Amino acid sequence: MSFRLDSFAPNWGASVMGTSVVAVATAAIGWPVWISRTLLILASLVAVVVVVVTGARWIRHRELALADLRHPIKGGMTATVAGGLLAWAVAIGRIGAGWLPDGLVTGAVAVLTVAGAVLALMIGWAFMTNLFTNQSTPTEHISGAWFIPPVVTIIIPLALVPLALELPDSSADLLALGWGFLGMGAVLYFVVTAVLFLRTVSHPLPPDALAPTLFIGMGPAGLMGLDMVRLAQASGNPGLVDAMTPLATMMWGFGFWWMIASLLVIRRGYGRLPFSLSWWGFVFPFGAWTVATSVLAQTWDSGLFDVMAWIATVLLVALWLMTSINTLAGIRRGTIWAH
């Protein structure tokens, strides 16, 4: 099957999110800078392609794009484009500092953060409004893809932190917005968790192609922990850092539980999964949790967390390589466009 613009899947943004978070993870653990910089360049190339193609599809095939947004499964996946912009912004802010000109880094992070945040809110509101007003969503269409809009919202505070540090006159406003976005995404995450839990225990599991979406739930847990620590650190208030670190660790622990539980469910309920584009749903959630592990290792000054962060980073890079290689092979053979 050859590439067709009208059939370009709405979840390609997950590849940008995944590559960006791997870049951040390798920087957070302290690996040689050329690794994270190379990954940032790759993430930037992928981001440009995905954004341009997605934009072209919205211009030339608007009705198909709107149909995806209204779909109870694809609608959630549409938010990955916004997530890609925000994860890219976080990667530029983390890795670009000290490498690229300060003005370029701040400007790029600001533009991507604003664009990503606006898209995240618009897509999230549109998706949720459609679900509420449709009132006939089949239970089998409830999936882990519903986690994506909350996940994307929770990335926004991490993109705001470097801006708050570089723009001291606006620091209080930016940090306040960060806490607000964290609350927005966190509450939505817990609501979706309850809905997905009820759906999963009372109905058959989603089809194979959606199995990786069950794994997405660990992502927001890691991101919430990261948000708490980073926002507290950016405030310059040691007392707030001390208060947020245990809460962040609690969320990290829930993310670890979710990771093991979802892998057990996938292993027992599905067996061997065929590769599909949805495999990128494994990369970003695990990457977010891995970065949280590295940050908590530094905050707690914990040798145990440091070892876990190293192991998780190695596994993350291996997962990203496997997913990337399979994606490139699918593009070469044309099979990826069927998903």
Predicted regions mapped to residue ranges:
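Juxtamembrane helix-loop boundaries in multi-pass membrane proteins
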Residues: 1-25, 62-90, 109, 113, ...
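Membrane helical hairpin/interfacial module
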Residues: 32-104, 112
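Hydrophobic, membrane-facing alpha-helical anchors
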Residues: 1-4, 55-67, 103-107, 122-135, ...
